[in-house]
Amino acid sequence: MKIFNKLIFLIIQCILIISVTNAQVDCGGTDNPYPIYNELPVLINQTTYGKLYKIGPPDNLINIIELYGTPYQRGLAQGQLLKSEINDIFDNFFGYITVMVNELVTKYADYLPKFLVDALEEGGVGLALDITADLTKKYTPKSFFEEMQGIADGSGIEYKTILRLHMFPELIKAACSMVGAYNSATLNKGLLQLRALDFGFDPMNPLRLHPTVMIYHPESVSAGGDGGHEFATLSWAGFLGTLTGYSQHVGICEKYWFGYNGTSSREGIPFHFLLREIIQFDESIDEALNRIINADRTCSVFMGLGSNQTNTFKAVEYSYEYVRVFDDQTPFPSYVPTPSAHPVIQDVVYIDKFVQPSNHQCLASVLQKSLGSIDVTSLINAAAQLQTGDIHIGIYDYQQNQMYVSVGTQSGPYPPPSNFTIVPAYARQFIQIDLNSFFNQ
């Protein structure tokens, strides 16, 4: 009977895959027209504990910063090398985030803890961020506070302001998409991971201004550091949490879980700090899952975990109440009938930018067309066709130890004039970063 049921399930999945593949799906976007930029980064400046590079064409420059030493020393180096950029973001951040959070509370008040909604109404975003900082403090490793103090000392910005900025991911709802493709699904049979961050892209968003790839070289515990291995994150100047990140062992990504209807809390470790701990300390998906399961969890997000050890990718439903894990053979989501638009695809795990369960056929259709030959270009075009990844996109090639990044328009006057046009990351040129030249120094 079990064999019969499994056979029926496989037949149904095949029918769903064929129907999605053969359907005329209007994704809304078109392929990305630009070649990948692959020139080397240029060293701009350095301090005792850091080096600053620029990479990209003149109209699409990205910072790369290497950070060495203890948490405080790494923070100090970032604050010194990116002082003007950090001040630029922080000077404009709270006005923008106030508008964004107020709009989100109007839409999603039912998904936020009541005390946070009350705090936003009574004391504004500042009070809500302060309460979040207080509730998460005892669950957050002290190394994060030391690194924030270093950023404050290096940049000249008040520590409390630095701390507040690092609490906002707990309040904001980012759409985002993720894909992990591996083994038979990819051209080189290695693991490729796509992370597309959709995060309120408009000309007034200061988080678009100074995109930065941060490459960490942690000092060993025996030498007074926090230990762990080297890793890279794609973020913006002054932010040390991780929403997009990769090491030679694991890679991570995330997406807000809009459909979660269970209990939430803010007493726990901020999810973006936990994600950074994964890429700094964990060497496999199992180790990352162990960290997730045993963590004091807060809000609800989907997480993506890739592993060089097993050459696989898994998606995680991460919430205060429970953790669920999905691989390429697990119907997604598990608690409702699998939408026909989200068929199981061998050696591919994916979640699109829409509220889940999603009935949008685009991503599955695009992946099916490239199945067996998925490469970096395939994932670049998948993001462009789905029109996902407005602030930034990261693609990790585990086999070659490469990171490909694209960012939304970061140059031009700020505040921008009313007629200022910006271009989202998915429609801009991708930049290749060879992590072999930065890791294992």
From Swiss-Prot:
Glycans are attached at N45, N261, N308, N419. Its main location: secreted. Keywords: Glycoprotein, Secreted, Signal. Induction: Down-regulated by Pseudomonas aeruginosa, PAO1 strain and up-regulated by Pseudomonas aeruginosa, PA14 strain infection. GO terms for cellular component: extracellular region. The keyword Ribonucleoprotein does not apply. It is found in: Secreted. It comes from the Eukaryota. The keyword Electron transport does not apply. Residues 1-23 form the signal peptide. NCBIfam families: C45_proenzyme. This is Protein dcd1A.
